[in-house]
Amino acid sequence: YEWKKENNVKQPYCFRPTSQPIFALAGLYEHWQDQSGREIDSCTILVGEANQDVAPIHDRMPIILKPEDFDCWLDPQVQKKEQLLPLLKAAPPGEVDHYPVSRAVNSPANDHADLIKNIQAQINSD
């Protein structure tokens, strides 16, 4: 989800690829020890410049990996930037759809399928 301020009201939007029901985001994971010896698992999702579909809502977007790039991205033997950097591109225009959803997405107490329901018709009727 990403939020956009419209008429002094913040509106959340759901984003999803248009061409595939399941997708993967480029991310990094590390297991390490801090100075006290405590073991820590950390992760991050990589973002890049937004494509023209996402730019009206936000200036950045997660890097969506193509299915044919999954093996390369997940292979720990692949460590040369020349092999990995070409995978870190914004999705081409037309490959990401977005629509407004309920503000209920803001609360972790809410966890149900209606959170991803498109509410554009409700907004238009208000």
What are these regions (language model features)?
Residues 1-126:
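A structured binding-face within diverse protein domains that lines the active/interaction site
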